[in-house]
């Protein structure tokens, strides 16, 4: 039986454990607005969104060479910049590994609050990334993340709730 070929989201020639800045977007399953709400440009986290934020910030404790930069927990997605600093080869952690661990941790913590029969898949199966290669691109990405709540109605992922 022939199965459809899945589109590869990662740049095949790039080492995603290499030092650098990575712009990450993680969407909820079916773009459900369960992470936050935005009214008049003001963002309010839900209980699930607060867990997602706490786990995002916890990435700073994974390894000394991994930090988070600007981030925003939107209603149905998270934007954030992950920074991988210089590290010895044996300490390498790749972006796919970090995002997999992040999504698993958030899901596990959320599932502790919900009866088994009410649990749903929280995340879409993949995520989007962009390698930030210049200082200008970093500044533009930070501005985009910072402005995202105010521009929610213009966002490609906007869903009226």
Task: List the model feature ranges, each with a label.
Residues 1-161:
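Short catalytic/metal-binding and nucleic-acid-binding patches
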């Amino acid at each position: 039986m022939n199965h459809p070929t899945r589109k590869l989201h990662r740049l095949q020639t790039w080492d995603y454990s290499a030092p650098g800045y990575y712009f990450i977007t993680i969407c909820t399953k079916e773009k459900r607005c369960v992470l936050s709400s935005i009214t008049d440009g003001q963002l309010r986290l839900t209980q699930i969104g607060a867990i997602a934020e706490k786990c995002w910030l916890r990435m700073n404790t994974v390894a000394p060479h991994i930090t988070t930069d600007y981030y925003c927990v939107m209603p149905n997605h998270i934007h954030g910049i992950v920074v991988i600093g210089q590290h010895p080869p044996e300490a390498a952690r790749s972006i796919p590994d970090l995002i997999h661990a992040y999504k698993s941790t958030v899901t596990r913590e959320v599932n502790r609050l919900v009866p088994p029969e009410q649990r749903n898949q929280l995340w879409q199966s993949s995520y989007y990334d962009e390698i930030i290669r210049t200082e200008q691109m970093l500044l533009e990405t930070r501005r985009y993340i910072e402005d995202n709540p105010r521009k929610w109605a213009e966002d490609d992922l906007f869903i009226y709730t």
